[in-house]
């Protein structure tokens, strides 16, 4: 009897629960979290949500986070594209400054090269004249050091270029200019008197060759001026 009563109560309970139950299929879109009390936290609601809908919710959350950033990303890309010409111009300015610094560092060498440019052109046009000019370069430096003492020879070059060139050709062979510049300058100061006394260019060249060996001209110029010139030699 007691067993029958217990079975009857169980059947009544099952029927009552079946009448009040709500069935949700696995493919339903209605979340279980909507049936939960509102005082539960969002974390508990997300845990109680249908597992099939969780990837969809995650995708919606990612899309909701990306969409506000899309206009900002587009604006930044547009700003970068607009700044590309400025970056290119800045690179050109940096390159120009580097080249300017390089030119300033080598301005001394550049100036020296520009000074020697006429000599390079002379070497290309007339190599013989260029070699002769190179041989006379030490005497040109001596002329720059003593301009007043070499003034008569500059006048000679303006009046008679042929005699001046003959005189300059003999200068590299004069060891006196290398050994004793003072004696060489004394010898050159006596040269205008020979130009007045000797009309013959050949005799003048011989005098130039013998002049470094004439000690009288170096020791006593006054007596040397009074000494006569006989033929092509001077003793």
Swiss-Prot record:
Zeins are major seed storage proteins. Keywords: Repeat, Seed storage protein, Signal, Storage protein. InterPro entries: Zein (IPR002530), Zein-alpha (IPR051903). This is Zein-alpha PMS1. The alpha zeins of 19 kDa and 22 kDa account for 70% of the total zein fraction. They are encoded by a large multigene family. It comes from Zea mays (Maize). It comes from the Eukaryota. Residues 1-21 form the signal peptide. The keyword Nucleotide-binding does not apply.
